[in-house]
Amino acid sequence: MHKIHVGLTGYVSIPDGGVFDDDLTVVNTARVSYNKKSDEWGDKDERLLKYLWDHEHTSPFRHASIRFEIKAPIFVLRQWMKHQIGCSWNEISYRYTQVEEPEVFYPGLFRSQDAKNKQSGTGILPLADQTKATEILHGGYEIAYRAYQALIDMGVCREQARIVLPVGIYSKAEWTASLQAIMHFIDLRLDESAQKEIRDYAVAIKTLAQIHFPQSIKLLNKEEFI
């Protein structure tokens, strides 16, 4: 198993048996049209792989896939789950599982709101505000969990008691994605406009994917072909 920790308690891992095929599968799938295949990776394969990606002939990249195990805050997973094409998701459900002393997310640093871009933060809050923001967040988590526990104790069903839970709680999910979907995720979520918290996970995904599909993931590093 390969595993990369993200933040204090999050992680991304590939379980044993979670990798399906390799770079050679991609180019050999493309060669089916000519009834040809390669047995070993060579320069012709690298050129073909680059041609396929550069010209958006992406169907061969959908024949390979990876299954990831993920532990991340719910708000990160909700962004991540917008990636649906070529993907399959399963996540812990707090309808079936009661939350016991939840693990919660704290930012390393709080950012200020960008005055022009409504969807992103920019810069870092002053130190005094960092401390206060952390205290406010911690208090919010405590209030939410006490409310959840009170609802459970009075007999409210789990599927309704969970309504009060914050999106900063960590959850676990399994994500199986085609190589094309993985590369698309990396390309989008490593962009500087992406939220830092999901960008940290995209770094981990890229690092793990590159172990098993080095030639394909290299296509995302355009400077390597200059």
What does each model-identified segment do?
Residues M1-I226:
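Family-specific signature for flavin-dependent thymidylate synthase
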